[in-house]
Curated annotation (Swiss-Prot):
Cofactor binding notes: Binds 1 Mg(2+) or Mn(2+) ion per subunit.
Annotated GO CC locations: cytoplasm
Keywords from the named record: ATP-binding, Glutathione biosynthesis, Ligase, Magnesium, Manganese, Metal-binding, Nucleotide-binding
Binding positions (Mg(2+)): E282, N284
Family statement drawn from the similarity comment of this UniProt entry: Belongs to the prokaryotic GSH synthase family.
Every ATP-grasp domain range: 125-311
Cofactor: Mg(2+); Mn(2+)
Catalysed reaction equations from the record: gamma-L-glutamyl-L-cysteine + glycine + ATP = glutathione + ADP + phosphate + H(+)
EC number from the UniProt entry: 6.3.2.3
Highest taxon of the lineage: Bacteria
Gene name of the encoded protein: gshB
Protein name as annotated: Glutathione synthetase
Single GO MF descriptor: ATP binding
The organism of origin for this protein: Vibrio vulnificus (strain YJ016)
Amino acid sequence: MMIKLGIVMDPISSINIKKDSSFAMMLEAQRRGWEIHYMEMNDLHLDQGVAIADTKVVQLKEDPNGWYEFTSEQTIELSELDAVLMRKDPPFDTEYIYATYILERAEEQGTLIVNKPQSLRDCNEKLFTAWFPELTPTTIVTRKAEKIKAFRQEHGDIILKPLDGMGGASIFRVKENDPNVSVIIETLTNHGQNYAMAQTFVPDISNGDKRILVVDGEPMPYCLARIPAKGETRGNLAAGGSGEPRPLSETDLKIANAVAPTLKEKGLIFVGLDVIGDKLTEINVTSPTCIREIEAAFDISITGKLMDAIERRLQAQA
């Protein structure tokens, strides 16, 4: 049977096809002869409780001058699609949450949503690590400046971050005698109105912040180590880091295997774990990336494994 696959993403016209994981996923689906329905967030609607979408059937090619062509436009019930990839980048704001409710209505009518809408809401990318405290750096989450200051007093060298950033935005390293600590805390907590996370600094960041991909509970054997630019503490590619594909170390695999069963159970089919040294720092569930860089360096089809997982789940549902 021909699978109809929907994808909700940021505008396809502005992606970098060399690096875009959503593009890689669509290429693999197209290779399998699936029909791909492209959507942006504003194409999703509810009508009397029924999830509706304005979709464009898209064809793709690996051509930096023109990588997509829309072949038809239609308004359909989302439940007409076999599966939908939710690949919208953060911010994880109320609009994003509303979109997950629309997708959940389609899920209730039998459409497979990757990742599961309820789990997208439940598993904040920074906070979800709290369910695995034995794997993470020492961590607190608070709005109170005095608690963060006491944490810094105790640990000396710490990282402060908001709970809703992506690409390394607003991540601060605060050392023992940093004169800016108060203003950093005020900025991050919005004067005590917002929660922020404080973690002990993991010195291994100079060796890279590793992105480990997990597909339907199976850790991929290779990761992308994102090496910080000189003088930086953030490895994120968006913050100027450079990517170095590598095989997983034993420790990487141990961490991934510890988290993977929970991910699978929660319907989190495609997830990116961030690991620094031997510590888990983030669990990315919204729109993890780094497929292209890993596939270019090693003989592996991560997108192939993802589409296999989708096929398996669809067969199990049938």
